[in-house]
Amino acid sequence: AERKPLPVKTTIIGGLACGAALTIASTLQQYGLTMTTVGKGGFITTLYIILTPILGIFIGRKAPKAVWFCAVLAVAGMFLLCVNGESLSISAGDLLVLGSALVFAVHILVIDHFSPLTDGVILSCIQFAVCGVVSAIGAFIFEQPSWEQLVSGAIPVLYAGVLSCGVGYTL
């Protein structure tokens, strides 16, 4: 049977939506990690695992009962991480990383919506292009990169981009 061509408009909209979500989530996470500990940042980031099915409820998905048990454990874990002595201490960095977990959950739901409607590789390429271009614009607005820094960092940035994004988000 011949495969029906996929709509280009849907692929572009999907890539833009996925790229926007990935950019926002990554930016919140990277900025938040500068203001919290690595352990807290790692734990809080993984809350996207619980947040994804919970957010899915708002678009008509059913969450398995185990999700609610895991959500209680996750909240308890976050509480234990954030209690400092006798006071509850949630830093701005913790909140930014929590925001990133929320947006990563949205990112997964957006991918889940568009991936059956489009070519996954093209969707991923558009997503990475959006994230890369928006992040580069942000770097030039908020940083003062020199030509020497760009050249010396090109190989590590390409390596990290291809492996962590290209492989990690595409496979």
Which role fits each region the language model picked out?
Residues 44-57, 73, 129-134:
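Alpha-helical transmembrane segments of compact multi-pass small-molecule transporters, enriched
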Residues 1, 13, 67-73, 92-96, ...:
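Hydrophobic alpha-helical transmembrane segments of multi-pass integral membrane proteins
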Residues 30-48, 91-103, 152-162:
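Structural signature of hydrophobic alpha-helical transmembrane segments
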Residues 2-45, 80, 161-171:
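Specific transmembrane alpha-helical segments of multi-pass solute transporters/efflux pumps
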Residues 18, 63-83, 101-104, 135:
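Hydrophobic transmembrane alpha-helices of multi-pass small-molecule transport proteins
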Residues 26-30, 50-53, 82, 104-109, ...:
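Residues that mark transmembrane-helix kinks and helix-interface sites
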Residues 32, 37, 58-63, 114, ...:
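Hydrophobic/aromatic residues within transmembrane alpha-helices
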Residues 2-4, 48-69:
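C-terminal transmembrane-helix exit sites in multi-pass transporters
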